[in-house]
Amino acid sequence: HARHQGNGVGYDSICAAGDHANTLHWIKNTGDLNDGDLLLLDAGVEVASLFTADVTRTLPVNGRFTDAQRTVYDAVFAAQEAGIAAVKPGAKFSDVHDAAIRVIAEHLHAWGLLPEGVDVETALDTEHGQYHRRWMVHGTSHHLGLDVHDCALARREEYLGAELVPGMILTVEPGLY
Protein backbone atom coordinates (compact mmCIF):
# COMPACT_ATOMS: atom_id res chain seq x y z
CA HIS A 1 0.00 0.00 0.00
CA ALA A 2 2.78 2.46 0.93
CA ARG A 3 4.49 1.99 -2.45
CA HIS A 4 1.32 3.00 -4.27
CA GLN A 5 -0.13 5.55 -1.86
CA GLY A 6 2.99 6.98 -0.28
CA ASN A 7 4.39 10.43 -0.89
CA GLY A 8 7.85 9.33 0.20
CA VAL A 9 9.65 8.39 3.36
CA GLY A 10 8.39 10.11 6.48
CA TYR A 11 11.85 10.40 8.04
CA ASP A 12 15.31 8.91 7.72
CA SER A 13 14.93 5.17 8.24
CA ILE A 14 16.83 3.55 11.08
CA CYS A 15 18.23 0.12 10.22
CA ALA A 16 20.68 -1.09 12.84
CA ALA A 17 22.00 -4.50 13.83
CA GLY A 18 24.25 -5.79 16.58
CA ASP A 19 25.83 -3.07 18.71
CA HIS A 20 24.51 -0.36 16.37
CA ALA A 21 20.98 -1.28 17.46
CA ASN A 22 21.93 -0.12 20.96
CA THR A 23 22.51 3.42 19.66
CA LEU A 24 19.29 5.40 19.72
CA HIS A 25 18.47 6.68 16.22
CA TRP A 26 21.40 5.03 14.40
CA ILE A 27 20.84 6.62 10.97
CA LYS A 28 24.19 5.75 9.40
CA ASN A 29 22.59 2.44 8.48
CA THR A 30 26.01 0.85 8.15
CA GLY A 31 27.37 -2.39 9.48
CA ASP A 32 27.04 -6.07 8.86
CA LEU A 33 24.07 -8.28 9.64
CA ASN A 34 25.62 -11.16 11.54
CA ASP A 35 24.15 -14.48 12.56
CA GLY A 36 22.78 -14.08 16.09
CA ASP A 37 22.32 -10.29 15.87
CA LEU A 38 19.05 -8.45 16.26
CA LEU A 39 17.97 -6.02 13.55
CA LEU A 40 16.15 -2.85 14.61
CA LEU A 41 14.01 -1.27 11.89
CA ASP A 42 12.34 2.12 12.42
CA ALA A 43 10.74 3.48 9.27
CA GLY A 44 7.69 5.30 8.07
CA VAL A 45 6.03 6.59 4.96
CA GLU A 46 4.40 9.95 4.41
CA VAL A 47 1.06 9.47 2.68
CA ALA A 48 -0.58 11.80 0.18
CA SER A 49 -2.52 13.54 2.97
CA LEU A 50 0.94 14.42 4.41
CA PHE A 51 0.42 12.35 7.55
CA THR A 52 3.43 10.26 8.55
CA ALA A 53 3.56 6.69 9.81
CA ASP A 54 6.13 5.39 12.31
CA VAL A 55 6.74 1.66 12.64
CA THR A 56 9.51 0.08 14.73
CA ARG A 57 10.30 -3.63 14.77
CA THR A 58 13.11 -5.77 16.16
CA LEU A 59 13.84 -9.03 14.37
CA PRO A 60 16.49 -11.73 14.71
CA VAL A 61 18.79 -11.63 11.67
CA ASN A 62 18.82 -15.43 11.39
CA GLY A 63 15.09 -15.78 12.04
CA ARG A 64 15.47 -17.21 15.58
CA PHE A 65 15.73 -15.42 18.92
CA THR A 66 18.22 -16.72 21.45
CA ASP A 67 16.70 -17.39 24.87
CA ALA A 68 18.12 -14.11 26.21
CA GLN A 69 16.90 -12.13 23.19
CA ARG A 70 13.42 -13.64 23.53
CA THR A 71 13.33 -12.77 27.24
CA VAL A 72 14.14 -9.11 26.53
CA TYR A 73 11.84 -8.98 23.50
CA ASP A 74 8.95 -10.35 25.57
CA ALA A 75 9.59 -7.78 28.32
CA VAL A 76 9.51 -4.91 25.83
CA PHE A 77 6.39 -6.35 24.21
CA ALA A 78 4.69 -6.58 27.62
CA ALA A 79 5.66 -2.96 28.29
CA GLN A 80 4.18 -1.93 24.96
CA GLU A 81 0.96 -3.81 25.72
CA ALA A 82 0.72 -2.05 29.10
CA GLY A 83 1.25 1.31 27.42
CA ILE A 84 -1.39 0.58 24.80
CA ALA A 85 -3.84 -0.44 27.54
CA ALA A 86 -3.31 2.98 29.14
CA VAL A 87 -4.34 4.83 25.96
CA LYS A 88 -7.93 5.94 26.51
CA PRO A 89 -9.90 9.16 26.58
CA GLY A 90 -9.30 11.06 29.81
CA ALA A 91 -5.91 9.52 30.55
CA LYS A 92 -2.89 11.81 30.63
CA PHE A 93 -0.30 11.47 27.89
CA SER A 94 2.26 10.63 30.60
CA ASP A 95 0.08 7.73 31.85
CA VAL A 96 1.08 5.77 28.75
CA HIS A 97 4.78 6.11 29.59
CA ASP A 98 4.17 5.38 33.26
CA ALA A 99 2.37 2.12 32.46
CA ALA A 100 5.05 0.93 30.05
CA ILE A 101 8.03 1.95 32.16
CA ARG A 102 6.61 0.20 35.22
CA VAL A 103 6.76 -3.09 33.29
CA ILE A 104 10.34 -2.30 32.21
CA ALA A 105 11.34 -1.55 35.81
CA GLU A 106 9.67 -4.74 37.07
CA HIS A 107 11.67 -6.81 34.59
CA LEU A 108 14.93 -5.02 35.36
CA HIS A 109 14.32 -5.70 39.06
CA ALA A 110 13.48 -9.37 38.44
CA TRP A 111 16.66 -9.74 36.38
CA GLY A 112 18.79 -8.18 39.15
CA LEU A 113 19.80 -5.20 37.00
CA LEU A 114 18.70 -2.47 39.39
CA PRO A 115 21.22 -1.41 42.05
CA GLU A 116 21.20 -3.45 45.25
CA GLY A 117 18.43 -2.32 47.58
CA VAL A 118 16.48 -0.52 44.82
CA ASP A 119 12.95 -1.81 44.40
CA VAL A 120 10.57 -1.01 41.56
CA GLU A 121 8.95 1.96 43.34
CA THR A 122 12.34 3.52 44.11
CA ALA A 123 13.49 2.89 40.54
CA LEU A 124 10.45 4.76 39.22
CA ASP A 125 10.69 7.70 41.66
CA THR A 126 11.03 10.78 39.46
CA GLU A 127 13.15 12.71 41.98
CA HIS A 128 15.44 10.05 43.44
CA GLY A 129 15.12 7.08 41.13
CA GLN A 130 14.95 6.74 37.38
CA TYR A 131 17.33 3.77 37.53
CA HIS A 132 15.61 2.21 34.52
CA ARG A 133 16.92 5.06 32.32
CA ARG A 134 20.27 3.32 31.97
CA TRP A 135 18.51 0.82 29.70
CA MET A 136 15.70 2.95 28.27
CA VAL A 137 16.87 6.48 27.59
CA HIS A 138 13.78 7.87 25.89
CA GLY A 139 10.10 8.40 26.44
CA THR A 140 7.60 5.77 25.40
CA SER A 141 5.33 7.72 23.09
CA HIS A 142 4.93 10.67 20.83
CA HIS A 143 2.01 12.07 18.89
CA LEU A 144 1.88 11.13 15.24
CA GLY A 145 0.43 13.34 12.55
CA LEU A 146 1.66 15.85 10.01
CA ASP A 147 5.08 15.42 11.58
CA VAL A 148 6.49 12.13 12.81
CA HIS A 149 6.87 13.76 16.24
CA ASP A 150 3.77 15.92 16.10
CA CYS A 151 3.58 18.41 18.98
CA ALA A 152 7.30 17.94 19.65
CA LEU A 153 7.69 21.68 20.12
CA ALA A 154 4.82 22.00 22.59
CA ARG A 155 5.69 23.06 26.12
CA ARG A 156 6.60 19.98 28.16
CA GLU A 157 3.92 20.51 30.83
CA GLU A 158 1.24 20.93 28.18
CA TYR A 159 2.41 17.90 26.24
CA LEU A 160 3.07 15.32 28.97
CA GLY A 161 0.21 16.41 31.21
CA ALA A 162 -2.26 16.70 28.34
CA GLU A 163 -5.45 14.69 28.46
CA LEU A 164 -5.94 12.16 25.68
CA VAL A 165 -9.06 12.73 23.61
CA PRO A 166 -10.65 10.76 20.77
CA GLY A 167 -8.88 11.33 17.46
CA MET A 168 -5.37 11.65 18.88
CA ILE A 169 -2.83 9.33 17.29
CA LEU A 170 0.28 8.34 19.19
CA THR A 171 2.99 5.73 19.19
CA VAL A 172 3.81 3.36 22.04
CA GLU A 173 7.50 2.47 21.64
CA PRO A 174 9.26 1.30 24.79
CA GLY A 175 12.67 -0.31 24.41
CA LEU A 176 15.66 -1.79 26.18
CA TYR A 177 19.14 -0.95 24.92
Q: Where are each of the predicted segments found?
A:
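Active-site neighborhoods and metal-handling regions in enzymes and metal-associated proteins
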Residues: 1-177
